[in-house]
Regions:
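Amide-donor transfer/coupling interface in amidating biosynthetic enzymes
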Residues: 58, 91-186
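A short, Lys/Arg-enriched amphipathic alpha-helix followed by its capping loop at the start of a domain
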Residues: 9-16
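Cysteine-nucleophile active-site neighborhood
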Residues: 38-107
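Short, small-residue-biased leader/transition segments that mark boundaries at the very start
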Residues: 1-2
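Structural signature of beta-strand start/N-cap positions in the alpha/beta core
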Residues: 16, 31, 62-64
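Structural motif
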Residues: 33-35, 164
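Short acidic low-complexity segments
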Residues: 17-28
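Structural alpha-helical scaffold elements that stabilize or flank donor/cofactor-binding regions
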Residues: 25-26, 55, 156
Length: 186
C-alpha cells in the first residue's frame, strides 16, 4: 500500500519511479526510497534471504527510509527482537503508554523540530507531518528532526547518504512534497 502511495506522490512531482527489488536496478538508481510496510522481523528476514540487506547498507546514492524503512535502518528492533541493517547505531523501542489517553499505535499529525538537514530546507516548525507507528527511535546523534508523543523521539535521521523519516511524507500534502523534493534534489 505505502509503496504505491510513495509512487503516486512522486508522480505528482513529475517523477517516474521504478518499484523494484532488483539488485542491479537498485545499484544503478539515482536515488532509492525504502518505504516500509509490515513487521520488522518478517521484513528483515526477507531482506536477508534475498541479499538486499547487504546491498542497501552499501548503497552510495541518497537513500530515504520511510516509517518501517527508517526503523530497519537502525541496529535492532524490539518488534520481533531482530537485528536490523545497523546503518544508524541506535535501537528501535516500543511505545509504552504512560497515561490513559496515550494510544498505541501513534496515529496522527505532529509538528517537528528540525535541524540543519537538507531534507528540511524551506521547512517551518509550524508544518505538520503524519505518523502511524507503534515503535520509535530515541533521539540520538543521527537525529535530524524530533517530535513528541508520550516522550520525545526521532522524527527523522541522517547519516552520510542515508536519510530516514518515521512519518510518511507521501501522506503529508504540500509539506511532504517539499520533503520529497528536497530528497530528490540531493
Amino acid at each position: 500500500v505505502y509503496k504505491r502511495q510513495v509512487d503516486y506522490a512522486l508522480k505528482r512531482l513529475g517523477v517516474e519511479a521504478v518499484i523494484t527489488a532488483d539488485k542491479e536496478e537498485l545499484q544503478s538508481a539515482d536515488k532509492v526510497i525504502f518505504p516500509g510496510v509490515g513487521e520488522a522481523e518478517t521484513t528483515m528476514n526477507h531482506l536477508k534471504a534475498t541479499g538486499l540487506d547487504e546491498l542497501i547498507k552499501n548503497l552510495r546514492q541518497p537513500v530515504l527510509g520511510i516509517c518501517l524503512g527508517m526503523q530497519l535502518m537502525c541496529r535492532y528492533s524490539e518488534e520481533g527482537g531482530v537485528d536490523c541493517l545497523n546503518i544508524f547505531d541506535v535501537d528501535v523501542k516500543r511505545f509504552v503508554p504512560q497515561r490513559h489517553e496515550d494510544k498505541v499505535p501513534h496515529m496522527g499529525w505532529n509538528t517537528i523540530g528540525k535541524t540543519n538537514s537538507k531534507l528540511f530546507e524551506g521547512f517551518t516548525e509550524e508544518e505538520f507531518v503524519y505518523f502511524v507507528h507503534s515503535f520509535y527511535v530515541p533521539t540520538c546523534n543521527f537525529t535530524a528532526a524530533t517530535t513528541d508523543y508520550i516522550h520525545p523521539f526521532s522524527a527523522a535521521l541522517h547519516k552520510d547518504n542515508f536519510y530516514a523519516t518515521q512519518f510518511h511524507p507521501e501522506k503529508c500534502g504540500k509539506t511532504g512534497e517539499k520533503i520529497l523534493t528536497n530528497f530528490l534534489n540531493l
